[in-house]
């Protein structure tokens, strides 16, 4: 069974698998500054909410490692924190990881060397926990996958979107590993083709039977192939269960509802943001118009044509059958049950 990591820490540098070039090329980048990490997040060298959070934590480590006792420690760390927070606005794991790091450095009274050591340990803890959490999510979610299941999936939620194993694709991977004889239909996921480029690459590496489809084929596929369930990830889950995920998830959820296909959101509890009341309160990133006007290096639309290119949409809670987390599966009513999930921690 193949395995791969999108992120690896090597003491004084962060090594990232550059996802912009998959599946054509497998390239790794070595990042040595917080500015490089912020740029990698913004340019989607690294992507996926959990992976972004881990990368940001290591960005803070790279910042503190460059500081000397003559530097204004808090000022420099705050600048790095602000830079990373501005890199991508929607994925709450980014802010969650930076908040964990900030609890340590804000008001720290020890030596600079101690702070360097403690921040590095916190980042490696966040990395390690991500893998452990993903494997527990997979074990919790696999009970929803029947033998011989046909599953539809949007975007990429596997090892490339996390440190390792994955969230929604982690459930799929575990179902395959225990012999459930599944078949996965992968939305190509325009405009950046994370389904066709990344999820299909992961499925090929893992030997999981799969078929790539265009995003607009989901309804036909559900009807023709009798899809059993839809599994998607999340970049932010509001307190009422509304879920921001890759653009096209909302469409998939509507089609799934019409065809009576249960749609489950798969995410760690760090993606649940109880401070955000509802989907309308989630900031939605908009990306370059050229992502729509071009495919690769080829222009496919007039340069003068206006473009609306949100990176995410919000799926209303009423279209979601359940939310699979490391602490269990949360069912409606989400506002009440998500709160209970944290109260029981």
UniProtKB/Swiss-Prot annotation:
Residues engaged in binding substrate: 47-49, 88, 194, 245-246
Alphabetical UniProt keywords: Amino-acid biosynthesis, Isomerase, Methionine biosynthesis
Protein EC: 5.3.1.23
BP GO terms, sorted: L-methionine salvage from methylthioadenosine
Amino-acid biosynthesis keyword on record: yes
Positions of the catalytic residues: 235 (proton donor)
GO molecular function, one term: S-methyl-5-thioribose-1-phosphate isomerase activity
Enzyme class: isomerase
Metal-binding as UniProt keyword: no
Family: Belongs to the eIF-2B alpha/beta/delta subunits family. MtnA subfamily.
Family matches, as NCBIfam families: eIF-2B_rel, PRK05720.1, salvage_mtnA
Purpose: Catalyzes the interconversion of methylthioribose-1-phosphate (MTR-1-P) into methylthioribulose-1-phosphate (MTRu-1-P).
Protein name (record): Methylthioribose-1-phosphate isomerase 2
Native source organism of the sequence: Pseudothermotoga lettingae (strain ATCC BAA-301 / DSM 14385 / NBRC 107922 / TMO)
